[in-house]
């Protein structure tokens, strides 16, 4: 009975940690109105101003930027359905092989070992994966993420209150 109570306690602690981290992550989200305020968009005067804006906006809008990157990942997978199918086959294949729990697969008169199943899965996934062009998708994803995130961070002015915060810290 004590082992059961220990495992329940451990599970509840894990869920509370996940909930706390999720709450902390969600508390970092800024409203859409604040994130997309077009009145605060302007071209930086020089590179150092752009650098300071990027630094400030990364710390302020990090949760929003992660959400944008997640949406771009979802869009990239929807845009490349073959890659999504290859990922599904890979995950399903590994799940099926692990479900055997190390036992060999018995097909009528043929026995296939666990290692051979992984080799067969790799032989199927590598050509399909190359045909699905994952490198192109990754390069597009990196480029689109950089343009969206760095573009917003560089052109979005920090609020006026942030200037007073730095003065207060100096005093």
Swiss-Prot record:
Residues spanning the membrane: 67-87, 119-139, 140-160
A biological-process GO annotation: endoplasmic reticulum to Golgi vesicle-mediated transport
Keyword Metal-binding tagged: no
InterPro entries tied to this protein: Prenylated_rab_accept_PRA1
Domain of life from the UniProt record: Eukaryota
Entry keywords, A to Z: Membrane, Transmembrane, Transmembrane helix
Molecular functions per Gene Ontology: small GTPase binding
Membrane topology: Multi-pass membrane protein
UniProt keyword Acyltransferase, yes or no: no
Name of one Pfam family that matches: PRA1
Compartment(s) where it occurs, according to its Swiss-Prot or TrEMBL record: Membrane
A GO cellular component entry from the record: membrane
PANTHER family named in the record: PRENYLATED RAB ACCEPTOR 1-RELATED (PTHR19317), PRENYLATED RAB ACCEPTOR PROTEIN 1 (PTHR19317:SF0)
Family per similarity comment: Belongs to the PRA1 family.
Protein name, entry field: PRA1-like protein
């Amino acid at each position: 009975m004590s082992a059961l109570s220990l495992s329940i306690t451990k599970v509840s602690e894990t869920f509370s940690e996940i909930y706390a981290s999720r709450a902390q992550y969600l508390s970092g989200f800024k409203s859409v109105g604040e994130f997309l305020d077009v009145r605060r968009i302007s071209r930086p005067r020089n590179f150092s101003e752009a650098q300071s804006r990027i630094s400030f906006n990364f710390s302020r809008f990090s949760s929003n930027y992660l959400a944008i990157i997640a949406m771009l990942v979802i869009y990239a997978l929807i845009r490349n359905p073959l890659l999504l199918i290859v990922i599904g086959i890979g995950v399903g294949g590994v799940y099926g092989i692990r479900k055997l729990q190390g036992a060999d697969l018995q097909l009528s008169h043929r026995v296939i070992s666990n290692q051979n199943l992984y080799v067969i899965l790799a032989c199927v996934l590598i050509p399909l994966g190359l045909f699905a062009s994952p490198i192109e998708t990754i390069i597009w994803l990196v480029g689109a993420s950089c343009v969206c995130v760095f573009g917003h961070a560089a052109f979005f002015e920090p609020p006026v209150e942030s200037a007073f915060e730095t003065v207060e810290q100096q005093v």
